[in-house]
């Protein structure tokens, strides 16, 4: 089954680098259709969707906000879909609140979030220390494993 990914560009390559690397590894060998603009979000039925976004130091991403608006204005846009989300930020703030906001919008648009649908990466990746220890890897390896 293919995956539809929505990855709003931040426009700051140095901040997007870590998320891009994780996505490259997580999506390797999978059929994925990746869209980067809000206008590209089209109604879908029963698909697997992934929202992966990078925030700046102020917790902002302009294209993400446009995607969020589109989800909120179209309550059946993701009807019957199953989804997940990855939120990556350069600091220790804003990732959780952004993830909660996006999860609610996805759910209200008809997308089910099943199991452990959220991967939250703070700047230090401190939230991956225990997972890294359990997996015998470093925090980046744990982040990548969680995204898969």
Cite the ranges covered by each PLM segment.
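FMN-binding flavodoxin-like domain, especially the glycine-rich phosphate-binding loop
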Residues: 2-37, 43-148
């Amino acid at each position: 089954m293919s995956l539809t990914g929505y990855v709003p560009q931040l426009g700051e390559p140095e901040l997007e680098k870590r998320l891009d690397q994780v996505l490259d590894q997580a999506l390797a060998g999978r059929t994925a259709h990746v869209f980067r603009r809000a206008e590209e979000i089209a109604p879908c039925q029963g698909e697997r969707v992934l929202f992966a976004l990078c925030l700046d130091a102020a917790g902002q991403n302009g294209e993400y906000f446009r995607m969020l608006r589109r989800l909120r204005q179209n309550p059946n846009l993701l009807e019957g879909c199953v989804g997940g989300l990855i939120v990556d930020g350069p600091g220790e703030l804003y990732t959780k609140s952004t993830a909660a906001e996006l999860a609610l919008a996805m759910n209200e648009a008809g997308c089910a979030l099943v199991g452990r649908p959220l991967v939250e990466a703070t700047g230090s990746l401190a939230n991956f220390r225990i997972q890294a220890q359990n997996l015998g890897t470093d925090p980046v390896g744990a982040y990548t494993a969680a995204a898969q």
